[in-house]
Structures are given as structure tokens and as C-alpha cells.
């Protein structure tokens, strides 16, 4: 097992396979974002036995050195099967223990779903929505929406709603997002958080989208993506 870092020249040869066909958590810009903006370190764990990679976030709490798995391990940009994932985790845990790298592995983000769980872990089952965009047309995807949402979309189109994408609509997305977080009494990220994703990953990997009604922003999403997948990480709407 090796811990590699995009910011270390000695590791760049092994990490050269981490291109835009990989999940965005494996990309150099993501490592740089966490290092410079979050002031945390991202390492790519590499199993020489399995020839597979997995991103890890290292950080500290008041009492513990922690590591967070950010995505399931992959080989040739394909997730390992459940048994291979378990083998990877066991090898990783042994390495982290031997090197005193961290004292606890914490749960991944909701978009970091794993197929296996290391022995003696505390865990819960979790599901998320995954839509295959390669094998379906836009019309086929739309027909799978709940009829209520199909009707709402048709109504918006009929009344002149406009959807815009790109960094230019980031401020309007933020209005929608913070309105929602206030309504549910939850803390929100700062605007600079979203700007930093654009700064480090660029428009090839980050997209904000906003729907407008009479030029007023009424809903927005924030997507982080690569050729591997697009993930909606934040969203919100204005009004009731």
C-alpha cells in the first residue's frame, strides 16, 4: 500500500492515470482545492496488489487524527467488486495502523457509497439515486419523473421559465441555496466555497445551474462532474 499525493512530483507518474475519466475526487484540482482552500490533505491510497486507487481525506479533530474515504476504490476507472473492496480496506487499515497515520476512519460523503464494510465497523445502510445518462434519452428520463414534477416542469416551460448554466449564475444559485438552508435551520457554506471549486477544478468539472421566472432566480443546483459521473452536491429554491 502506498499513499500518493498529486502535489508530490515523485508520485505523479503513478497518478498519471487519474484523468477526467476518473471520479472528480481523484483529480489533481480536487487535491489542490483541499490543500489550499480547506487546509487539509488528500492522498490517493494505492494497492500494488490490487492495482487500485482510492482517495482519502486526512484531518484532525480535537482528540483524534482522522481519515475519510471519499470514493470507493477503482481500477481502470471501474469500482472494485465487493470482495475486492473489502480486501482493499483490510490492506489500507493494516497500513494506517502500522504507520500511525490516523486513529479513526469516518464515513464517506453521501456520494461516496461503498460496496463493502471493514470488519468491526459501525455502519448503516444508505442509498442514493444514480441515473444512467448514457443509455437513455432525455425523453425517457423525463417519463420516469413523478407525474407531479412532470406537470410542474411543463407549467414552467409554458410560462417562460429559463434555465441558465455556468459560473455567471453562481451568485443566483447561492441565493436559492441559502434561502433553503435558512428555511430548514441548517448552516450554509460560504459563497467562496463554491467559487473555489470553480477556481481549482474549472468549468470542465463544475457547473452551477439556475432556473429563472421573469428574470428572478427561483431554483438552483451545484454539480461537480467528470466523464465518470455528475453529482448534484448542493441545491435550493426561493420562496415557500
Predicted regions and their residues:
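Conserved GNAT acetyl-CoA-binding A-motif
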Residues: 98-109
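Acidic, aromatic-enriched beta-alpha/helix-loop junctions
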Residues: 72-76, 85, 97
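A conserved beta-strand-loop-helix scaffold within acyl/acetyltransferase catalytic domains
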Residues: 2-63, 108-131, 136-240
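Surface-exposed alpha-helical segments enriched in charged/polar residues
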Residues: 90-97, 154, 199
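Glycine-/proline-rich flexible loop or hinge segments
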Residues: 64-80
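Conserved acetyl-CoA-binding loop-helix of GNAT-fold acetyltransferases
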Residues: 82-94, 240
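Intrinsic-disorder-associated interaction segments
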Residues: 8, 23, 78, 82-85
Amino acid at each position: 500500500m502506498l499513499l500518493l499525493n498529486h502535489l508530490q512530483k515523485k508520485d505523479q507518474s503513478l497518478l498519471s492515470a487519474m484523468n477526467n475519466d476518473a471520479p472528480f475526487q481523484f483529480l489533481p484540482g480536487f487535491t489542490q482545492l483541499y490543500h489550499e482552500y480547506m487546509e487539509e490533505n488528500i492522498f490517493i491510497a494505492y494497492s500494488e496488489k490490487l492495482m487500485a486507487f482510492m482517495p482519502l481525506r486526512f484531518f484532525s479533530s480535537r482528540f483524534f487524527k482522522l481519515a475519510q474515504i471519499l470514493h470507493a476504490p477503482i481500477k481502470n476507472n471501474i469500482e472494485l467488486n465487493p470482495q475486492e473492496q473489502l480486501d482493499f480496506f483490510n490492506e489500507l487499515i493494516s497500513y494506517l495502523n502500522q504507520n500511525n497515520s490516523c486513529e479513526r476512519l469516518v464515513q464517506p460523503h453521501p456520494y461516496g457509497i461503498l460496496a463493502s464494510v471493514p470488519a468491526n465497523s459501525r455502519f448503516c445502510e444508505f442509498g442514493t439515486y444514480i441515473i444512467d445518462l448514457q443509455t437513455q434519452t432525455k425523453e425517457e428520463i423525463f417519463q420516469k419523473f413523478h407525474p407531479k414534477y412532470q406537470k410542474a416542469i411543463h407549467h414552467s416551460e409554458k410560462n417562460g421559465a429559463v434555465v441558465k448554466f455556468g459560473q455567471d449564475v453562481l451568485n443566483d444559485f447561492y441565493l436559492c441555496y441559502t434561502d433553503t438552508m435558512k428555511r430548514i435551520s441548517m448552516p450554509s457554506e460560504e459563497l467562496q466555497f463554491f467559487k473555489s471549486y470553480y477556481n481549482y477544478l474549472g468549468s470542465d468539472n463544475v457547473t452551477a445551474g439556475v432556473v429563472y421566472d421573469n428574470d428572478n432566480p427561483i431554483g438552483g443546483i451545484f454539480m461537480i462532474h467528470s466523464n465518470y459521473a455528475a453529482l448534484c452536491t448542493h441545491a435550493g429554491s426561493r420562496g415557500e
